[in-house]
């Protein structure tokens, strides 16, 4: 517990909040060759590796992920949501923030239905997250 004189001399320091998706908060200026702190909700990138990973205990599955080199030069690991995907190496994707709780080191999610990432086929409910168009009713 600080004394009154300690508080007068030094005061209280504000807590610094740490970003949960730090790669979205940086922009690379290629003309000046330096990084600026300009946050964005999405970032475009190119897949450098598409692979699978097993989750932490107690879950059991084979989760798909992609290693993505972003437009700001950073390389991140992003989760591929939904059943089945068409992503390969050199596919252009859009990523957003949002971690996968049971995959360590995965802080980003690929947006389905944009760029080279196709939407999930035959999806009726919750289509917005998976980039699926509304089915035609006959």
UniProtKB/Swiss-Prot annotation:
InterPro entries: NA-bd_OB-fold (IPR012340), Ribosomal_uS12 (IPR006032), Ribosomal_uS12_bac (IPR005679)
Pfam families: Ribosom_S12_S23
Swiss-Prot/TrEMBL keywords: Methylation, Ribonucleoprotein, Ribosomal protein, RNA-binding, rRNA-binding, tRNA-binding
3-methylthioaspartic acid modifications at: 102
Family: Belongs to the universal ribosomal protein uS12 family.
Function as written in the Swiss-Prot or TrEMBL entry: With S4 and S5 plays an important role in translational accuracy. Interacts with and stabilizes bases of the 16S rRNA that are involved in tRNA selection in the A site and with the mRNA backbone. Located at the interface of the 30S and 50S subunits, it traverses the body of the 30S subunit contacting proteins on the other side and probably holding the rRNA structure together. The combined cluster of proteins S8, S12 and S17 appears to hold together the shoulder and platform of the 30S subunit.
Name of the protein in question: Small ribosomal subunit protein uS12
